[in-house]
From Swiss-Prot:
GO function terms (MF aspect): phosphatidylinositol 3-kinase binding; signaling receptor binding
UniProt protein name: Hematopoietic cell signal transducer
Cellular compartments annotated: Membrane
BP GO terms, sorted: positive regulation of phosphatidylinositol 3-kinase/protein kinase B signal transduction; regulation of immune response
Keyword Magnesium applies: no
UniProt region (PIK3R1 binding site), positions on chain: 71-74
Entry function: Transmembrane adapter protein which associates with KLRK1 to form an activation receptor KLRK1-HCST in lymphoid and myeloid cells; this receptor plays a major role in triggering cytotoxicity against target cells expressing cell surface ligands such as MHC class I chain-related MICA and MICB, and UL16-binding proteins (ULBPs); these ligands are up-regulated by stress conditions and pathological state such as viral infection and tumor transformation. Functions as a docking site for PI3-kinase PIK3R1 and GRB2.
Superkingdom per UniProt: Eukaryota
Cytoplasmic side: 56-78
Residue intervals annotated with topology Extracellular: 19-34
Primary location group: membrane
Organism: Macaca fascicularis
Topological type in the membrane: Single-pass type I membrane protein
Length: 78
């Protein structure tokens, strides 16, 4: 369950971001376009790898039939 304090923090985060003055970061450099594109591409690849791993782990596995027999539930036979 999410703690109510966390929800309040998430709601107030845009307000705090709006209060900061632009250029208040000392020593921060701007990101070049190739670096930004590389970060976005790496994030997309990492996301696809995570989705693939979850898909492989979550899909149902087929159990092999024993001795070539398949069990079929047929009431009344027995």
């Amino acid at each position: 369950m999410i703690h109510p304090g966390h929800i309040l923090f998430l709601l107030l985060l845009p307000v705090a971001a709006a209060q900061t003055t632009p250029g208040s970061c000392s020593g921060c450099g701007s990101l070049s376009l190739p670096l930004l594109a590389g970060l976005v591409a790496a994030d997309a690849v990492a996301s696809l790898l995570i989705v693939g791993a979850v898909f492989l782990c979550a899909r149902p596995r087929r159990s092999p039939a024993q001795d070539g027999k398949v069990y079929i539930n047929m009431p009344g036979r027995g």
